[in-house]
């Protein structure tokens, strides 16, 4: 199989400082990503996402400030691409970390150490086969269900949920 061509991609790294940021930038470059912008401040990163086109965002999830980056990005009306893939990069995430990232609108969680192949595979999946986006009163982001499951039991909900919309990028 041919190596994917990511030379035209513009990717943003948010919140990664020093050695961590340099390593992530190196791995993205080794995966073939053509243009990588590294920003430490999440407010500045959101501003840049509103004014420039980016194909994906990698968020270092070690800072409290960057923990809510995905939520802010998904809620921001001025964002040029509200369906942009957002990847959270963790070193040893726990289940609750993954669930929180998912609930904040993160597309996928990546564990460090990360390889160019992992980055390439995750980018390909997010760009070529994106999950549908859900627009609900309390959530906007990729469908949180990793895979579709057939439910054969009865409805156990105690309350009828408020109306949600599935957004499909065409």
Label each PLM-derived region with a short phrase.
Residues 114-127, 135:
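C-terminal output helix
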Residues 68, 92-108:
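Alpha4 helix (beta4-alpha4-beta5 surface) of REC/receiver domains from two-component response regulators
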Residues 7-19, 24-28, 38, 57-58:
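Conserved acidic segment of CheY-like receiver
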Residues 128-170:
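CheY-like receiver
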Residues 33-41, 48:
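Short hydrophobic/Thr-rich beta-strand motif most characteristic of the beta2 strand and flanking loop
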Residues 51, 55-82:
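Conserved phosphotransfer microenvironments
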Residues 12, 57, 62, 80-95:
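A short, hydrophobic beta-strand element within the central beta-sheet of small alpha/beta folds
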